Amino acid sequence: MNFNLFPLFAVEGGFGLNLNPLDTNLINLIIVIGVLFTFLRGFLGEMLERRRQAILANLSDAEQNLKNASVALNKAQLDLAEAQERAARILADGKTRAESIRVNSERRTIDAMAALKQDAIADLSAEMVRISEELRLQTALQAIEKAMVTLPTKLDETAHSKLIDQSIVNLEQA
């Protein structure tokens, strides 16, 4: 039995481990990696730098938007507080005005009722005076009528002339 311990380390062709540094791809790999590192470092560095700048710009824009939103929020809150204060003033003014209108309306109603009562009293007084005058007039007419009926029988010629003279004197004094 012939055992070959190094069948994988063939000198010609195939797969094997070559320990000669000049013959190996190690130098080629180092050169390729060095060239890639040299050229890609600038390209990747620029790409990463652009990405970093874009991220910083986006972050700066976001911070600016946050500041603008905060300013707008503060302004809106101030406007809201002012609007609420104005609404409270309008409500208070409205309540005051409504109360004033109610009081004025009540006062005018009371005044109108008092005026109606005074008018009714005045009308009643005027009606009483008119009725009283009418009753006096009717009473006077009835008295005159009765006197006219009874007077000719009760008056003689001297009493009649005396009555006429006295009536003339009364008319002259009046």
Swiss-Prot record:
Pfam families in UniProt: ATP-synt_B (PF00430)
Cross-referenced InterPro entries: ATP_synth_b/b'su_bac/chlpt (IPR002146)
Protein's cellular compartments: Plastid, Organellar chromatophore thylakoid membrane
Molecular function terms from GO: proton transmembrane transporter activity
GO cellular component, one term: organellar chromatophore thylakoid membrane
GO biological process, one term: proton motive force-driven ATP synthesis
Spans through the membrane: 26-46
Keyword Protease included in the entry's annotation: no
Keywords, comma-separated and alphabetical: ATP synthesis, CF(0), Hydrogen ion transport, Ion transport, Membrane, Organellar chromatophore, Plastid, Thylakoid, Transmembrane, Transmembrane helix, Transport
Bilayer topology: Single-pass membrane protein
Subunit structure comment from the entry: F-type ATPases have 2 components, F(1) - the catalytic core - and F(0) - the membrane proton channel. F(1) has five subunits: alpha(3), beta(3), gamma(1), delta(1), epsilon(1). F(0) has four main subunits: a(1), b(1), b'(1) and c(10-14). The alpha and beta chains form an alternating ring which encloses part of the gamma chain. F(1) is attached to F(0) by a central stalk formed by the gamma and epsilon chains, while a peripheral stalk is formed by the delta, b and b' chains.
Family: Belongs to the ATPase B chain family.
Function: F(1)F(0) ATP synthase produces ATP from ADP in the presence of a proton or sodium gradient. F-type ATPases consist of two structural domains, F(1) containing the extramembraneous catalytic core and F(0) containing the membrane proton channel, linked together by a central stalk and a peripheral stalk. During catalysis, ATP synthesis in the catalytic domain of F(1) is coupled via a rotary mechanism of the central stalk subunits to proton translocation.
Protein name according to UniProt: ATP synthase subunit b, organellar chromatophore
Gene: atpF
